[in-house]
Design a protein with these regions (language model features):
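Helix-boundary and loop/linker segments of multi-pass membrane transporters
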Residues: 2-4, 137-142
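Helix-loop-helix junctions that connect adjacent transmembrane segments
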Residues: 1-20
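Helix-loop junctions at the membrane interface of multi-pass solute transporters
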Residues: 14-40, 44-49, 60-65
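Extracellular/periplasmic helix-exit of transmembrane alpha-helices
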Residues: 50-129
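Membrane-interface interhelical connector segments
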Residues: 131-136
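Membrane-helix boundary/coupling elements in multi-pass transport proteins
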Residues: 16-35, 95-126, 145-167
């Protein structure tokens, strides 16, 4: 997390998604079911790349709505920031990303979890970002928790079916 221009990172993110789309085409067990003729492969491949690029852009948008302090709270190991919200907030603030323990506790409560500290990996971080976006579209007291858990479920099902189809 740093401040700076979106260029070239937006294009790197889109290219990553496009490459993943290509990998989905060549390794997926569902691709042969979509192909009636060899000439259809190019369109299916490009469609996969475009959809993967869209997913990459959505991930970038979800990451950009997160406060950097929350991002570091979620992605830093417990050994570095502590399991205590007050100590974690102090460590993250000392890193240069001001945040207070009340914000960490409030965010955890909003998403229906006991804590958001040390939730390493992209899935929880993306889920919190998507929950922020979606709860703005459909407001409500419990909607943040709903969208957070929906995003986690969607990610898990998407990944599991992609792995299943690709193996």
């Amino acid at each position: 997390v740093f401040s700076g221009a979106l260029f070239p990172f937006l294009f790197i993110t889109i290219a990553c998604g496009a490459v993943s789309g290509f990998h989905a085409l060549i390794s997926s067990g569902t691709t042969p079911k979509m192909v009636e003729n060899e000439t259809h492969v190019r369109m299916i491949g490009y469609g996969g790349m475009i959809m993967e690029s869209f997913v990459a852009i959505m991930a970038l948008a979800a990451a950009s709505v997160l406060d950097p302090g929350i991002y570091f709270a979620m992605n830093s190991p417990t050994a570095l920031i502590s399991a205590d919200a007050v100590q974690a907030a102090q460590v993250i603030t000392d890193m240069g990303f001001p945040i207070d323990s009340a914000t960490l506790l409030h965010t955890a409560k909003e998403v229906g979890e006991n804590t958001i500290l040390s939730r390493a990996g992209g899935a929880p971080t993306l889920a919190v970002g998507m929950a922020h976006i979606m709860s703005q579209l459909i407001p409500g007291e419990a909607m943040m928790a709903f969208w957070y858990h929906f995003a986690l479920l969607f990610e898990a099902l998407f990944i599991l079916t992609a792995v299943d189809a690709g193996t």
